[in-house]
């Protein structure tokens, strides 16, 4: 079984660096990391950082233009993945190392589950009081937004049955 760790990124240099360094060390040898970079709004520094890892066989990096629909964007990312399961992560998220270690067992032990509710550490660069008020976020003393910020994570077999939908 192969897991694709699928990541979308735009301008989160510190966050994508942290996430990629973590995943490269924590993932199994047979798993892959797939990064989809927004080439229209993304920064050259982010592309440079992820390009530094292009020679690594476990990683693939793709630059495309985000067209204002997250469902389409995440479906594009899904199509780039070659694993049996996909674990989609935003650049500003950091999964716990125990989760990554146990994920293969969780997936194999629960073959009928298509999604899992996973707490994430969510940080936002340049967060302002206006952002916090507008989005009604709670920020703790470690700058984590809405901790524990539970998100439905899609861990799907690549059978085309699960898609992100626009609404």
Task: Label the model's feature ranges.
Residues 2-5, 31-35, 113-116:
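Hydrophobic beta-strand segments of well-ordered beta-sheets in folded domains
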Residues 3-15, 19, 26, 36:
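A conserved hydrophobic helix/loop-capping motif in glycosyltransferases and polysaccharide synthases
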Residues 21-63:
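Acidic donor-binding segment of Leloir-type glycosyltransferases
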Residues 63-70:
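Short, acidic/glycine-rich phosphate-metal binding loop used to engage nucleotide
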Residues 90-94:
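The conserved acidic donor/metal-binding loop of glycosyltransferases
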């Amino acid at each position: 079984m192969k897991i694709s760790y699928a990541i979308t990124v735009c301008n989160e240099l510190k966050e994508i660096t942290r996430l990629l360094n973590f995943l490269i060390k924590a993932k199994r040898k047979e798993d892959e990391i797939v990064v989809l970079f927004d080439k229209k709004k993304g920064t050259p520094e982010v592309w440079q950082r992820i390009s530094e890892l292009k020679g690594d066989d476990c990683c693939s990096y793709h630059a495309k233009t985000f067209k204002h629909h997250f469902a389409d964007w995440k479906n594009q990312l899904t199509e780039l993945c070659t694993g049996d399961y996909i674990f989609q992560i935003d650049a500003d998220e950091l999964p716990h190392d125990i989760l990554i270690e146990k994920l293969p067992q969780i997936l194999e032990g629960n073959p009928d589950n298509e999604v899992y509710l996973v707490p994430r550490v969510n940080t936002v660069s340049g967060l302002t009081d206006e952002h916090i008020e507008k989005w009604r976020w709670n920020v703790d003393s470690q700058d984590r937004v809405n901790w524990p910020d539970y998100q439905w994570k899609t861990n799907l077999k690549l059978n085309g049955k699960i898609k992100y939908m626009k609404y």
